[in-house]
Amino acid sequence: AAITLSPETSAQLRTFAQGHHVTLNTLVQGAWALLLSRYSRESEVLFGTTVSGRSADIPGIERMVGLFINTLPLRVRVAPDAVLSEWLRALLERNSELRQFEQTPLVQIQSWSDVPRGQAFFESLIVFDNHPLDESLEKATGLTIQGVTLQGQTNYPLTLNVLPGKELTLSLWYHRNRFRDETAARMVRQLETLLRAIIQNPRARLGLLPLLASAERAQVVGAWNRTGRAYPADMLANLRV
């Protein structure tokens, strides 16, 4: 399941992030935390986030070839009365605190927690691709690459892959033995709805941010509740139930 935001909406998200001194990654993490909280009905959620691993204090690390990425757990409290803009800044600070563990294996981090070994630490992951393929190649060679499709797989039931650029793309990879196709598609649409709500209501309370788009809300509230029927005037009341 995937969705590509329009250039206008993508630009608005970048402008919002810059204006509120957060990152685009923070906005996506915030929307994902809100979505997980609504689905689980929990005030605290835990999901994985990938880090580059290249901010470590190692001489010459920026010139080293190979993968340094690591996956770290991000625990987020979603208080319904929290102010969105302040909550996002706190989320950014939480990400900054995680940097000290960039080189720490996830299995070691789990050993420090109350989650037993062998039990899933978390069941969803966000992968934010800071270096889109086409932009990197264009800068290096002057060539434009089009029609590229990326496919990936992780061991987590849900993986949100975020591809920034002129048009922000959100791709949700999921295990079909856990989630139906229509459920994954709905989650991606609701994620877009939350992102749009974030840039429109920076001072909103978290609990008031909409999960349904206008058309979906109209269907649920209006169309699905049109259950009125005409009954004969002389019918007994107990027969109308």
Task: Identify the role of each PLM range.
Residues A1-A185, E192-Q200, L208-S214, G222-T227, ...:
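Adenylate-forming
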